């Protein structure tokens, strides 16, 4: 199980963790479109219902999206099937998530800077 799946799993199964880290997570931090969509659905569910979503609820919400192809929905179902209620030590999980958020934010900022620099150089 990779870290992104661990984060998504714990957002679904561990309320204390979800309440602690959700305000700091951004969809841009996730590396695939499918992970981003699952994260967005989890975030939206928690925001709307003030409760953790079940995997069934997430599956239904994803199925109702109109911006997914059949293959993308199939991949999202595979991601959902990877989510588990495996216990992780809370402090380790929060620290690891915080570090991951910082690393992803730095990486995305660097990539944006490179893109801006490259665009600027090409314009001149």
Language-model regions, residue ranges each:
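Conserved small/polar residues in nucleotide/adenosyl-binding loops
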Residues: 119-124
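A short N-terminal interaction module
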Residues: 105-111, 118
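Noncatalytic partner-interaction/assembly domains of nucleic-acid and motor enzyme complexes
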Residues: 1-100
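Generic hydrophobic alpha-helical segments
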Residues: 42, 113-114
């Amino acid at each position: 199980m990779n870290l992104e799946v661990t984060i998504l799993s714990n957002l679904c199964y561990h309320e204390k963790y979800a309440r602690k880290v959700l305000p700091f997570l951004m969809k841009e931090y996730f590396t695939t479109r499918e992970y981003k969509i699952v994260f967005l659905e989890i975030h939206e569910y928690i925001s709307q219902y003030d409760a953790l979503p079940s995997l069934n609820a997430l599956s239904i919400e994803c199925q109702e999206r109109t911006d997914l192809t059949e293959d993308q929905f199939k991949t999202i179902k595979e991601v959902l099937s990877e989510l588990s209620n495996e216990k992780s030590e809370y402090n380790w999980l929060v620290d690891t998530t915080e570090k991951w958020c910082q690393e992803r934010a730095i990486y995305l900022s660097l990539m944006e800077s490179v893109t801006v620099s490259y665009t600027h150089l090409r314009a001149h």
